[in-house]
Amino acid sequence: MTNRQRPTRILAFDISGSPGFAVVEYAEGKRPKLVHATSIKTDSKRTDAERYAYIEATAAKLIYEYGPFDVVCREHFVGGRNKRASQTVFGAWAAIDLALGRFGYTIDKADEFTPAAVKKAATGSGKADKLEVEAGVRKRLVLPDDYVFTADDQSDAVAVALAWIDSNTTK
């Protein structure tokens, strides 16, 4: 009987008013595997309460369908363009934290990554643009060149998972 190590299952978020979600599996010495990536677009014409409820429900559905998780991580929010943009992100952040809490999960400070660290994980450069991040994620996961993330938020969430892998594995 072989003793096979179970892969680490990572749930990663790119949190905004239109958040990205990714589920990635990783086993030491193996290539990370994309299990699921999605994002949602909230309607800015809706009330904040409606938008945050939708974000929370989507996160809860994802946690229910793809859990259990060994790690939950997110991109660290460093400030919005203005007060309203910051409020939107913090509201989405709280909505996701509510969903996580319902299933017994939290996000440790050590599992939050700066935008530069996320970009570097995907591309090798902390100054990459969105298209470079998407291409880097495809390359790192060996996804076909024609694999399309339907929103930047999806590839960004995958890049967050890659940042966690890079910071928690031996090279």
Segment roles from a protein language model:
Residues 1-171:
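Phosphate- and other anionic-substrate recognition elements at nucleic-acid/protein interfaces
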